[in-house]
Amino acid sequence: YIKLPIKEKIDNDISFGHGYISIALVFFRLWKCTNNQRYYNLGGDFYNEFYSSFEEHKKEKFKDLNFSWCRGILGILIAELEIMNIMDNEKHSSVVEALEPLLLNMDMSGNDGLCHGNIAVTEYFLKKYEYSRNEEDLKMAQIIVQNIINRNHRENRFMLRYAKGFKSIGLFTGLSGIGYQMLRVSNPEKIKSILD
């Protein structure tokens, strides 16, 4: 038995970590596993809330969005790919069409971590590769990893958030996440995503 959430306003937040799209994805996954129509309907309701907010942000050229997984473009794109795969249709591709060019035109971030940084961008291209088997997507993920490694060699460190006196070794904001994602890029069929 699952207690269904009471709809509440999420302050027009379209991010994966704090917005409606992640809730929609959960219900669409439940529907896919159970074939229970109420989960599909709830997924659709939450997706419509997301899409309405998305259209408002689009009018403002996504000025409040960053490129992170949790609060930005990257998380939205990954969720869209997941929903498109579950729904087995192209209905949601307008979101990808609007946001992917922003991702492709971004410069390297000052952070290499999995939640907020450059290594997370590899996950979008690995998801695309997983669903399309387009080798160009896998190649793009490999290029991003190589760029991160090259900068690490120049700077003699990965660009991470550090607390004075402590190395950042955690999964989402530290070295563990970078290492895990590098393993995933080297073998995406065997190493599963931790961002979806």
Mark where each language-model region is.
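Well-ordered alpha-helical segments within folded domains of soluble proteins
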Residues: 12-31, 65-82, 113-129, 170-184
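Terminal, non-catalytic domain-edge segments
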Residues: 82, 86-90, 94, 98-102, ...
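Long, well-ordered core segments of solenoidal/helical folds
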Residues: 1-10, 38-59, 87-110, 140-157
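Alpha-helix initiation and capping sites
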Residues: 20, 36, 73, 88-89, ...
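Alpha-helical scaffold segments of alpha-solenoid architecture
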Residues: 31-34, 39, 46-74, 78-85
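Charge-dense, low-complexity intrinsically disordered segments
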Residues: 10, 14, 37, 135
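Intrinsically disordered, low-complexity segments enriched in Gly and acidic/Ser/Thr residues
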Residues: 106-114, 125, 130-136, 140
